[in-house]
Amino acid sequence: MIRFAPALAAAATCALATPAFAQQTDVSDPLPTGEEATVFDGDFLSVGVGVGYNPSYSGSDDYNVNVLPIVQGSVWGVDINPRPAGLALDLIPDAAEGVSFSAGPMVRLRNDRVDAEDINDDVVAAYGELDRAVEVGGSVGVKFPQVLNPFDSLSFTLDATWDVAGAHDGRTISPSVTYFTPVSRATAASLSFSTSFVDDDFADYYYSVPATNAALPAEDVLPGFDAEGGMQSYGFNLLLAHDLSGDLTDGGLSLVGIAGWTKLVDDAADSPFTSIRGDNDQYLVALGVGYTF
């Protein structure tokens, strides 16, 4: 299993993410301490709450504030890792030392434009609400420890999901790479780079625009657009986590700050929902607090 600590940090990244910020971050022990016991040695659970400021839909230049619960942990040898509005399970035991692997099932909800009241653009809202997608698939990863110092790691993760709820009926593939390092005994940081690729069904559902719309005056109707699959986005997330007890390894209360930028590309950027009514530069700022035990 691949672990990241404090666990709240990864949970906050994913729980506060919009569809454009489908960032993967897995759990990782913060500081190898030899024989010294840590809260992450056996079963543990992290719970908390986060507040995020993020786009009102994928491609929007209007932003909403969201308050979301956070949960992550390891139970009976199975890591529970957050995904945006979902979870991924890691079923592979950690290697005693050296390279570690992760693999397991995942499920997530996609809530993009499902509620017109959350779309802060009257023109986009006039094109109607979308159905909530339920995406099921799997996640695999590999972690290389001690890259630049004895306590850091470099992780590669790949998520693939398919909608099973009859919303977009499509597929997403999301590779990411994360560098994690403790800054001190109390503070850790990670920098992640991620990309996302979607198929034609996904792109058509979220980014195509019909040529007519009777709900809008003629001057507000957007030009018709037929979106096709391909690369949807790439971006970076920077995360800082600070344990309030001064020791990342003993659990307790932690504070987490996240800043992220995502660039929509290809048809996700060319869609009038983005190019006319929104912006292909998407930003995320989030703060979280939680308790690990």
Where are these regions (language model features)?
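Outer-membrane beta-barrel transmembrane domain signature
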Residues: 142-146, 164-174, 178-254, 261-269, ...
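Residues that define the transmembrane beta-barrel architecture of outer-membrane proteins
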Residues: 43, 63-69, 99, 130-136, ...
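Transmembrane beta-strands of outer-membrane beta-barrel proteins
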Residues: 43-49, 69, 80, 101-105, ...
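Residues on the lipid-exposed face of transmembrane beta-strands in outer-membrane beta-barrel proteins
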Residues: 49-53, 69-75, 87-93, 105, ...
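Transmembrane beta-strand segments that form the barrel wall of outer-membrane beta-barrel proteins
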Residues: 47-55, 78-89, 123-125, 153-164
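Extracytoplasmic loops and strand-loop junctions of Gram-negative outer membrane beta-barrel proteins
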Residues: 51-54, 119-124, 158-160, 216-225, ...
